[in-house]
Design a protein with these regions (language model features):
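Long, charge-rich, low-complexity alpha-helical segments
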Residues: 1, 21, 336-387
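Active-site region of the double-stranded beta-helix
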Residues: 1-17, 30-182, 190-232, 236-237
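Short acidic (Asp/Glu) and glycine-rich catalytic loops that position anionic groups and cofactors
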Residues: 22-23, 196-199, 229-239, 324-326, ...
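Short coil/turn segments at secondary-structure boundaries
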Residues: 57-59, 271-274, 361
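C-terminal amphipathic alpha-helical segment
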Residues: 224-298
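Acidic, low-complexity/disordered tracts enriched in E/D and polar residues
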Residues: 265-349, 374, 385-387
C-alpha cells in the first residue's frame, strides 16, 4: 500500500492525523512506477464519444475550457505548453489502472469514485480550485508542482466565467514538486493548484462524498415504495382562535416529529445508502450477457477453465446485520443469509477483487454461491476474463 515505503508514518497515524484533516506528501510512495498508458493513448480515449474529457488552456490568470470528444487532428495543432487534457473514469476504460486502488485499500472500496488521468504540457494547469472530495494525486511521467492553500466551503468566492470554478482569492502556504512515483494526499475542501514543471501524467484517485441533498433524495426514493401509506400528517390540537391560512408553530412541530419518525428507520437508511454508494458511474458499460447461462452451465464453464472478473464499472459493498448479509451491487440490494460460510467467503472475494481475476474454485460446488454468481454474470456485473 501507499504507506509501505514510509517508515516515518504508519496507517493508524495517517488515518487519525491526516485523513480528512491535512495534506501529506509521500515521496517515492510507488517506487519504479510505470504509467498505465501513454499521453497518446490518453488522447485517443478523449476522441471517443462515450468518454468524458476536456482540455483546459491557461494563460496568466485566464482559462479556457473545451469539452470532448475531440478529433485526432485537434491534438496536432496544440502548442507545447500551457494546456491540460483531463479524462474522467479512465479506470473504467483501462482496467489495469484499478490496481492503483489496491494502494488505497485502507479506505472502503465503495468510497472510491473514479481515477481521472490528466496530461499537462509544460506550464499546463487548471487553476486554483477545491474539491468536495478527498483525492490522492499520483505522479506518473514528468513532474508537477502543487500549491496548497486554505480550506474552502460552499461560501468561498469563485470565478466561473471560464466554465471552471476558479478560486477568486488563492494564497498558497505550501508548495510541493512531485516526481514519478510520488503521491500527494489532498483533503476535501483544501484549495490547491497544479502546474506542470515537465510535461507528464497525473492519476487522481477521487472519493465519492454525497451531500445531504443526495442522501435525502436516495432515502426518499426508497421510502416512496416502503413507508406505510397510513403514516400521514395529522393536525395538532387546533386552537379555537386559529387564523385562516396561518401555518402555526405547533403545526411545524407536528411535521418535524412526523419527518423524524420517518427518518428513524435503520433498514431504509442502510438500503438507501448502500444503493446510493454503489450506483455505477458509467452504467452504460454494464451490458447483460449476450448468452445467459444457467447455474448448471456456469458450473461446466468454470470447470473447463472459464475465468471471471468484475466488470470495470461494477461497484460492490456489504453490511452484516443480524442474520442477514446485505449485498449491494450497482445500486441494487440483495439480502443473503449471514450464517452461510461459503456465501460470506464469496462476498469477501467479490469485495476485494479490484483489478484481478476472481478465485472461484472454492465456490463451484456450492449451490447458493453459483446462484449468486450466475445472476451477477447474466446481469453483466461479472465478465469473462479475456487474458
Amino acid at each position: 500500500m501507499l504507506l509501505d515505503n514510509h517508515d516515518s508514518i504508519d496507517l493508524p497515524t495517517f488515518l487519525s492525523e491526516y485523513w480528512q484533516k491535512k495534506p501529506l506528501l509521500l515521496k517515492n510512495a510507488l517506487p519504479g512506477f510505470i504509467d498505465f498508458l501513454s499521453p497518446e493513448e490518453l488522447a485517443g480515449l478523449a476522441c471517443e464519444e462515450s468518454v468524458e474529457s476536456r482540455i483546459v488552456f491557461n494563460t496568466p490568470n485566464k482559462w479556457e475550457v473545451k469539452n470532448g470528444p475531440f478529433a485526432e487532428r485537434e491534438f496536432t495543432f496544440l502548442s507545447e505548453q500551457d494546456w491540460t487534457l483531463l479524462v474522467q473514469s479512465v479506470d473504467h476504460w483501462v482496467p489495469e489502472i484499478k490496481s492503483l486502488l489496491q494502494d488505497t485499500a485502507f479506505i472502503p472500496s465503495w468510497r472510491v469514485d473514479d481515477v481521472m488521468v490528466s496530461y499537462a504540457a509544460q506550464g499546463g494547469g487548471v487553476g486554483p480550485h477545491f474539491d468536495y472530495y478527498d483525492v490522492f494525486l499520483v505522479q506518473g511521467l514528468g513532474s508537477r508542482q502543487w500549491q496548497l492553500g486554505k480550506t474552502c466551503n460552499s461560501k468561498t468566492p469563485l470565478n466561473t466565467s471560464s466554465g471552471l470554478k476558479i478560486l477568486g482569492d488563492f494564497i498558497p502556504d505550501q508548495t510541493f514538486e512531485l516526481q514519478t512515483g510520488d503521491v500527494l494526499y489532498v483533503p476535501a475542501g483544501m484549495s490547491h493548484c497544479g502546474k506542470a514543471v515537465e510535461a507528464g501524467l497525473c492519476y487522481s484517485i477521487g472519493f465519492r462524498a454525497p451531500d445531504v441533498a443526495e442522501l435525502l433524495a436516495a432515502y426518499s426514493h426508497l421510502a416512496n415504495d416502503t413507508l406505510p401509506a397510513d403514516l400521514r400528517y395529522r393536525d395538532p390540537v387546533v386552537e379555537a382562535d386559529a387564523k385562516p391560512g396561518e401555518i402555526s408553530s405547533s403545526t411545524l412541530q407536528q411535521v418535524k416529529v412526523l419527518m423524524q419518525h420517518a427518518l428513524d428507520n435503520e433498514e431504509l437508511l442502510l438500503q438507501s445508502f448502500g444503493c446510493l454508494m454503489t450506483e455505477p458511474r458509467l452504467p452504460e458499460l454494464l451490458v447483460t450477457a449476450e448468452v445467459e447461462l444457467s447455474p448448471e452451465q456456469l458450473i461446466v464453464h468454470l470447470q473447463k477453465g472459464m475465468q471471471l472478473s468484475c466488470n470495470s464499472a461494477s461497484r460492490f459493498a456489504c453490511h452484516h446485520r443480524g442474520d442477514g448479509l446485505y449485498f449491494f451491487v450497482n445500486g441494487e440490494c440483495l439480502v443473503l443469509p449471514n450464517d452461510h460460510e461459503k456465501l460470506a467467503a464469496l462476498n469477501t472475494e467479490l469485495q476485494s477483487a479490484v483489478g484481478r481475476t476472481l478465485n472461484l474454485t472454492p465456490f463451484q460446488r456450492n449451490k447458493s454461491c453459483i446462484k449468486l454468481l450466475v445472476w451477477l454474470y447474466n446481469q453483466g456485473y461479472l465478465v469473462e476474463t479475456t487474458e
